[in-house]
């Protein structure tokens, strides 16, 4: 039996290990340990992942010899790869959080060190041998059966050497006893061997068994095994296999193989959960289970074979032997005496295992469901049979470990964590996982014999979750399985594991969070804070090591406070990396107030600590003393643990802190510089989610500068945007942000140096830095992976920078220009429409503040261009006002009709579009009807201003709106005709006063749809990538063209004509992001030459210098090229406006005057409007992502772009928050953010519309 068992166990364990090794090789690029191991591992890796048992069955016992060969290389991997990988990883080694822990391990005999690296594995295996899937579990169990009574570290050595030798024969058997091997698996998972595999597996299995892996990882986070995110998952895989094995001794033998057959899927799934359960239970149950397995395994193994025969028949022969060796291996109690003594426990175990065996064969049937099935059987049997005792016995520790496990798994293992938490009450899939996990942590030293007594019952459910054993793998398993036989080693191991716990927490948190390895360091910092937050949750996790003997009593009560302190103290270090900006982001001002002490700031926020990063690192060491006052040895490991992660993190953070401290100085200078300050404010807007950030915008940039460094390293990894993490993903919501943000975090990690240096150092822009900190699309992303965006950033940044600061100054100037030019003309309208305009303005603040951005731009052009045109054609303008009003009212009525129909199809899309066109269109209607200059303004804004934009908008408008238009030719055409008439009149104002425009209106009303698409596209599209920009962009253009331009227009410095320019810019915006910048320069010259353009430019120079020139070049070119195109644009504009015929109908009469009033008011309010405008744009969630590519430009013109950024990135999801916060922020930021024109309504409207708008855009197009 031993031979077959060894063959099976070895095979299984070898497979699991070879799988881990294979994964580690893939991850770490390590050469395969051995050809046999590779073969077994590769076969087994797929088989383990897909059907471990089947592979093992297929390979049968022969693989046991083959796996035994690569096994030493795996052990070597564990030794060198684990440590090397850990060191390479940049944070605590897999096994050792600190170099001191590593040195301790190295100080241990090389064997011991290798096994200490395996120790989480070996000890876990011994404590969690019940998991039986771990290689070390088999090794450990063999070692345990032979040397289990002896020192666990000796057992570790034996586990490695003797265990490996015996494991080959006993390996499979011990896989069946994989319940104990669960910890072995955990330990091994923690070890470098499983490290690579588990890193990959943590990603593979993290997704596969997110909840189980979460449990496993969460507990691993607590234990050494979980040090590596990989360890938790690879162990999870094995644990799941083991878990299946753990269910029964018999089941473990037979069901584990069978489980391995189809446990490939289940192994990962149950692995994490079951690992947590089984490891916890195995800590306490292993010996009982193993002895039980010894006695009853044979009887139940036959049953299990009969039940599991269908799947793992080969394994069935070895289950008995496997159980026997395993029983030998786990005996914390003397293997011979404990096994017989545990015969009665096995009797307990057998009833539960038998059902599990019975259930288990079905589980193998459904590998996907195997996890669920296995866990539920584990639940049912553990919950009913073994969970009652273990739960009662482990409930206290389970409660603590529940928090621990749930908190440990909180980062990425929240799912298992709730099951853990509910394990006590609900004993759900992980009922024992936590209780056993707690015992593993808590009872490993003291309660493991009792735990084993419980474990007979608990073994059936030996979801013996030894994720804590990984924590305790070093400290708990040596002391735990020997049941305190080696407390000194236990202390050492505890120190080791404490250090590893931090490492595993940091690494596993990253793993559980699922950040890629490149993010692991970044997440390491961040997750050290985050995990320290979870370490607060995990407090008991640490304490179990200090209180391994009285873990239940001590761990629940003292551990949480101690760990609260310690994680808090350590957290300040890590969190200062992450939260140093995050809490500032939350508190905003406090971090800004103490920006010099990035850690001090946050340390103060998180904990009263010195502002010294190194001090923070030292404090974690000191805090551990307080935390681990009970066990100074543990404190020492914590110190080394903190020392290594602390040193690394502290050094990293310190360097980063120095860097961005220097950057802070630079940023302060930059902040003194309005542009740079604007930039800084904008990042703070990006970090605006923390309200104080708004006020501490300047200071916050410093803090964000730090966070930039820290956030880049830890914050971005931490989605730091934690404030912005979700919104960044919302940024990912669309392409630009999506590709920007996802990499932004990794790039933030890269940006720790690149962005950390660049964002707060190289770029030195608080905006860029906070962007990098918040993984904001612009600077960090741009700098790191968005260098295209970086050019965009610089282009947009630079162009909007000069426009943006003037907009601050220019709101009045623009207003004065508009007032000077349009005031004479608009004063009458203002007086007439004063009340109406105020009402309408209020209404349009909601409605038109969307167009308000275009309106501000058009109002300025209306005033400036209106001066040219109005002075030239005051009669035409008056006529147009009357005629346009008359026609606009019918048009609006018609639009109300057609809009009622079209609104169903196009209203949302149009309402969205019309929100932008509404600005544009309201401006167009009011301006087109009311003012020929507004025609220019309006046409340039959405259509004429940028041929590409116009074509974008016309194409989308004419393409998608042409369909509705043709569907409603009468209504749309009347609208078109009226609008075209007005618009054509305006355009023809210079050429033909009213007759030609009317003719164009009538004759071109339908054509403009196609003509605008065709003629507008040919001209502007030729100059701009509008073919795609029109239709393709308009998919984004409904929100992309519309919102992007609206959003980007302010960013591009088109703020006066945001609505008008907003449409064009999207077409420019995603591709023409650069083009608008280049185009603006080209347009600038042309517009400077162009009187209207120049007047518009002069009036809107600050914001529109870039936007307006290009807008007006497009406008002039468009008008010059195609009067009908202009008309079509107006038609298109009307069509977007047609969405709001009711609004236009309301405004119809007052639209021109009201538009003029709005032009003036928007000139005044546009600065505020623009800040709100981005917020309004944020309402268009799609465009923020579109803005994300445009965000550089948007980002650059910090006023509106900031709002856009914040709304898009930060407040894409919560535009309301952005709207509520950004208006003040933007007003704080820029000269024009002051007015929250139509902030919430617009955002709400646009928010409502953007999805449908995008869909309808796509649909209509």
Swiss-Prot record:
<keyword id="KW-0597">Phosphoprotein</keyword>
<feature type="compositionally biased region" description="Low complexity">
    <location>
        <begin position="301"/>
        <end position="315"/>
    </location>
</feature>
<dbReference type="Pfam" id="PF15336">
    <property type="entry name" value="Auts2"/>
</dbReference>
<keyword id="KW-0539">Nucleus</keyword>
<dbReference type="GO" id="GO:0003682">
    <property type="term" value="F:chromatin binding"/>
</dbReference>
<keyword id="KW-0804">Transcription</keyword>
<comment type="function">
    <text>Component of a Polycomb group (PcG) multiprotein PRC1-like complex, a complex class required to maintain the transcriptionally repressive state of many genes, including Hox genes, throughout development. PcG PRC1 complex acts via chromatin remodeling and modification of histones; it mediates monoubiquitination of histone H2A 'Lys-119', rendering chromatin heritably changed in its expressibility. The PRC1-like complex that contains PCGF5, RNF2, CSNK2B, RYBP and AUTS2 has decreased histone H2A ubiquitination activity, due to the phosphorylation of RNF2 by CSNK2B.</text>
</comment>
<keyword id="KW-0805">Transcription regulation</keyword>
<dbReference type="GO" id="GO:0001764">
    <property type="term" value="P:neuron migration"/>
</dbReference>
<dbReference type="GO" id="GO:0010592">
    <property type="term" value="P:positive regulation of lamellipodium assembly"/>
</dbReference>
<feature type="compositionally biased region" description="Polar residues">
    <location>
        <begin position="868"/>
        <end position="879"/>
    </location>
</feature>
<keyword id="KW-0206">Cytoskeleton</keyword>
<feature type="compositionally biased region" description="Pro residues">
    <location>
        <begin position="800"/>
        <end position="809"/>
    </location>
</feature>
<dbReference type="GO" id="GO:0048675">
    <property type="term" value="P:axon extension"/>
</dbReference>
<feature type="modified residue" description="Phosphoserine">
    <location>
        <position position="1200"/>
    </location>
</feature>
<feature type="compositionally biased region" description="Basic and acidic residues">
    <location>
        <begin position="275"/>
        <end position="298"/>
    </location>
</feature>
<dbReference type="GO" id="GO:0098582">
    <property type="term" value="P:innate vocalization behavior"/>
</dbReference>
<keyword id="KW-0966">Cell projection</keyword>
<feature type="compositionally biased region" description="Basic and acidic residues">
    <location>
        <begin position="960"/>
        <end position="993"/>
    </location>
</feature>
<dbReference type="InterPro" id="IPR023246">
    <property type="entry name" value="AUTS2"/>
</dbReference>
<dbReference type="GO" id="GO:0030426">
    <property type="term" value="C:growth cone"/>
</dbReference>
<feature type="compositionally biased region" description="Low complexity">
    <location>
        <begin position="339"/>
        <end position="409"/>
    </location>
</feature>
<feature type="compositionally biased region" description="Basic residues">
    <location>
        <begin position="8"/>
        <end position="17"/>
    </location>
</feature>
<dbReference type="GO" id="GO:0005737">
    <property type="term" value="C:cytoplasm"/>
</dbReference>
<feature type="compositionally biased region" description="Polar residues">
    <location>
        <begin position="435"/>
        <end position="446"/>
    </location>
</feature>
<feature type="compositionally biased region" description="Basic residues">
    <location>
        <begin position="1127"/>
        <end position="1136"/>
    </location>
</feature>
<feature type="compositionally biased region" description="Basic and acidic residues">
    <location>
        <begin position="812"/>
        <end position="849"/>
    </location>
</feature>
<feature type="compositionally biased region" description="Basic and acidic residues">
    <location>
        <begin position="1245"/>
        <end position="1261"/>
    </location>
</feature>
<feature type="compositionally biased region" description="Basic and acidic residues">
    <location>
        <begin position="148"/>
        <end position="158"/>
    </location>
</feature>
<feature type="compositionally biased region" description="Polar residues">
    <location>
        <begin position="177"/>
        <end position="192"/>
    </location>
</feature>
<feature type="region of interest" description="Disordered">
    <location>
        <begin position="105"/>
        <end position="236"/>
    </location>
</feature>
<comment type="similarity">
    <text>Belongs to the AUTS2 family.</text>
</comment>
<feature type="region of interest" description="Disordered">
    <location>
        <begin position="251"/>
        <end position="486"/>
    </location>
</feature>
<keyword id="KW-0963">Cytoplasm</keyword>
<feature type="compositionally biased region" description="Basic and acidic residues">
    <location>
        <begin position="105"/>
        <end position="118"/>
    </location>
</feature>
<feature type="modified residue" description="Phosphoserine">
    <location>
        <position position="1235"/>
    </location>
</feature>
<feature type="region of interest" description="Disordered">
    <location>
        <begin position="1201"/>
        <end position="1261"/>
    </location>
</feature>
<dbReference type="GO" id="GO:0097484">
    <property type="term" value="P:dendrite extension"/>
</dbReference>
<protein>
    <recommendedName>
        <fullName>Autism susceptibility gene 2 protein homolog</fullName>
    </recommendedName>
</protein>
<feature type="region of interest" description="Disordered">
    <location>
        <begin position="505"/>
        <end position="545"/>
    </location>
</feature>
<feature type="region of interest" description="Disordered">
    <location>
        <begin position="771"/>
        <end position="1023"/>
    </location>
</feature>
<dbReference type="GO" id="GO:0005634">
    <property type="term" value="C:nucleus"/>
</dbReference>
């Amino acid at each position: 039996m031993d031979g077959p068992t060894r063959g099976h166990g070895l095979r299984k364990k070898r497979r699991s290990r070879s799988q881990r090794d294979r994964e580690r090789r893939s991850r770490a690029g390590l050469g395969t340990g051995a050809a046999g191991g590779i073969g077994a591992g590769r076969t087994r890796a797929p088989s383990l992942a897909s059907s471990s048992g089947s592979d093992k069955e297929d390979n049968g016992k022969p693989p046991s010899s083959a796996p035994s060969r690569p096994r030493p290389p795996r052990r070597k991997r564990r030794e060198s790869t684990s440590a090397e990988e850990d060191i390479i990883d940049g944070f605590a080694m897999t096994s050792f959080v600190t170099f001191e822990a590593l040195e301790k391990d190295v100080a241990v005999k090389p064997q011991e060190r290798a096994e200490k690296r395996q120790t989480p594995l070996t000890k876990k295996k011994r404590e969690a041998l019940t998991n039986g899937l771990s290689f070390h579990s088999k090794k450990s169990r063999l070692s345990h059966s032979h040397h289990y009574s002896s020192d666990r570290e000796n057992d570790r050595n034996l586990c490695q050497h003797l265990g490996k030798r015996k494991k080959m024969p006993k390996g499979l058997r011990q896989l069946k006893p994989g319940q104990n091997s669960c910890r072995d698996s955990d330990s091994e998972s923690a070890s470098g061997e499983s490290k690579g595999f588990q890193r990959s597996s943590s990603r593979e299995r993290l997704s596969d068994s997110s909840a189980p892996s979460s449990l496993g990882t969460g507990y691993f986070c607590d234990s050494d095994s979980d040090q590596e995110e990989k360890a938790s998952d690879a162990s999870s895989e094995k644990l799941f296999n083991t878990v299946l094995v753990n269910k029964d001794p018999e089941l473990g033998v037979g069901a584990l193989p069978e489980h391995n057959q189809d446990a490939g899927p289940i192994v990962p799934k149950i692995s994490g959960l079951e690992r947590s359960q089984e490891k916890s239970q195995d800590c306490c149950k292993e010996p009982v289970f193993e002895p039980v397995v010894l006695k009853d395994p044979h009887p139940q193994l036959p049953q299990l074979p009969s039940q599991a025969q269908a799947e793992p028949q080969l394994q069935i022969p070895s289950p008995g032997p496997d159980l026997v060796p395993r029983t030998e291996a786990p005996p914390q109690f003397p293997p011979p005496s404990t096994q017989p003594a545990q015969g009665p426990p096995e009797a307990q175990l057998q009833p539960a295992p038998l059902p599990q065996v019975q259930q288990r064969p079905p589980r193998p049937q459904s590998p996907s469901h195997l996890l669920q099935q296995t866990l539920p059987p584990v639940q049912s049997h553990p919950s009913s049979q073994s969970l009652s005792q273990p739960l009662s016995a482990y409930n206290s520790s389970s409660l603590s470990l529940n928090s621990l496990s749930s908190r440990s798994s909180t980062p990425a293992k929240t799912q298992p964590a709730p099951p853990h938490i509910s394990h006590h009450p609900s004993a759900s899939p992980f009922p024992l996982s936590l209780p056993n996990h707690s015992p593993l942590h808590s009872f490993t030293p003291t309660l493991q014999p009792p735990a084993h007594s419980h474990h007979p019952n608990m073994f059936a459910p030996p979801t013996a979750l030894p994720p804590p054993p990984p924590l305790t793998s070093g400290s708990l398993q040596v002391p735990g399985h020997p049941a305190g036989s080696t407390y000194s080693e236990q202390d050492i191991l505890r120190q080791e594991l404490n250090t590893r716990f931090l490492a595993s927490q940091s690494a596993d948190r990253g793993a559980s969070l699922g950040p890629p390895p490149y993010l692991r360091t970044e997440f390491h910092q961040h997750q050290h804070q985050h995990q320290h937050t979870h370490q607060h949750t995990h407090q008991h996790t640490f304490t179990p090591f200090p209180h391994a003997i009285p873990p239940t009593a001590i761990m629940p009560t003292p551990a949480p406070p101690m760990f609260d302190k310690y994680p808090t103290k350590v957290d300040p270090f890590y969190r200062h990396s992450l939260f140093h900006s995050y809490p500032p982001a939350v508190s905003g001002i406090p971090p800004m107030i103490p920006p010099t002490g990035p850690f001090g700031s946050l340390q103060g926020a998180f904990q009263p600590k010195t502002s010294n990063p190194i001090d923070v690192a030292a404090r974690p060491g000191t805090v551990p003393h307080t935390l681990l006052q009970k066990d100074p040895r543990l404190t020492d490991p914590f110190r080394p643990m903190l020392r290594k992660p602390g040193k690394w993190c502290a050094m990293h953070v310190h360097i980063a802190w120095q860097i961005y401290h220097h950057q802070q100085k630079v940023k302060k200078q930059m902040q003194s510089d309005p542009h740079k300050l604007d930039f800084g404010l904008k990042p703070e807007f990006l970090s605006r989610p923390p309200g104080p950030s708004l006020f501490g915008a300047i200071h916050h940039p410093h803090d964000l500068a730090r966070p930039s460094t820290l956030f880049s390293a830890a914050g971005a990894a931490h989605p730091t945007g934690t404030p912005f993490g979700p919104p960044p993903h919302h940024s990912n919501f669309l392409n630009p942000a999506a590709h920007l943000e996802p990499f932004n975090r990794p790039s933030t990690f890269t940006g720790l140096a690149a962005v950390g240096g660049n964002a707060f150092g190289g770029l030195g822009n608080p905006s860029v830095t906070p962007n990098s900190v918040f993984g904001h699309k612009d600077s960090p992303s741009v700098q790191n992976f968005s260098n295209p965006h970086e050019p965009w950033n610089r282009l947009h940044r630079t162009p909007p920078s000069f426009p943006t600061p003037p907009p601050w100054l220019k709101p009045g100037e623009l207003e004065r220009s508009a007032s000077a030019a349009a005031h004479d003309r608009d004063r009458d309208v203002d007086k007439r429409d004063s009340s109406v305009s105020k009402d309408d303005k209020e209404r349009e603040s909601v409605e038109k503040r969307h167009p308000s951005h275009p309106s501000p731009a058009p109002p300025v052009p209306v005033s400036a261009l209106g001066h040219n045109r109005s002075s030239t054609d005051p009669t035409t303008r008056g006529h147009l006002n009357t005629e346009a009003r008359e026609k606009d009212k019918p048009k609006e009525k018609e639009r109300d009709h057609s809009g009622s129909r079209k609104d169903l199809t196009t209203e949302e899309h149009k309402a969205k579009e019309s929100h932008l066109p509404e600005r544009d269109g309201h401006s167009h209607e009011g301006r087109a009807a009311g003012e020929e200059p507004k025609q220019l303004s309006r046409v340039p804004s959405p259509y004429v201003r940028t041929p590409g934009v116009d074509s974008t908008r016309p194409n989308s408008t004419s393409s998608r709106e042409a369909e509705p238009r043709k569907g409603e030719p009468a209504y749309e055409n009347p609208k078109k005709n009226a609008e075209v008439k007005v618009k054509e009149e305006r355009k023809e104002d210079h050429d033909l006063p009213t007759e030609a425009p009317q003719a164009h209106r009538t004759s071109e009303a339908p054509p403009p749809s196609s003509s605008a698409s065709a003629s507008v596209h040919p001209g502007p599209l030729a100059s701009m990538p509008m073919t795609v920009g029109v239709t393709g962009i308009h998919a984004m253009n409904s929100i992309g063209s519309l919102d992007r331009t609206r959003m980007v227009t302010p960013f591009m410095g088109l703020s006066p004509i945001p609505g008008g320019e907003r449409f064009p810019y999207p077409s420019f915006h995603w591709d023409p992001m650069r083009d608008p910048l280049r185009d603006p320069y080209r347009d600038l010259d042309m517009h400077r030459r162009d009187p209207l353009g120049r007047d518009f430019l002069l009036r809107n120079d600050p914001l529109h210098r870039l936007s307006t020139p290009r807008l007006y070049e497009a406008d002039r070119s468009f008008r010059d090229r195609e009067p009908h195109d202009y008309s079509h644009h107006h038609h298109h504009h009307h069509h977007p406006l047609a969405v709001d015929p009711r609004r236009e109908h309301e405004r119809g009469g007052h639209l021109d005057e009201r538009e003029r009033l709005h032009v003036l008011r928007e000139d005044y309010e546009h600065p505020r409007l623009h800040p709100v405008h981005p917020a309004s744009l944020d309402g268009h969630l799609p465009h923020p992502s579109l803005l994300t590519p445009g965000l550089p430009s948007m980002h650059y013109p910090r006023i509106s772009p900031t709002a856009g950024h914040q709304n898009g990135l930060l407040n894409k999801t919560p535009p309301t928050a952005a709207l509520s916060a950004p208006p003040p922020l933007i007003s704080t930021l820029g000269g024009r953010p002051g007015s929250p024109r139509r902030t919430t309504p617009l955002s709400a409207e646009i928010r409502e519309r953007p999805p449908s708008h995008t869909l309808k855009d796509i649909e209509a197009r």
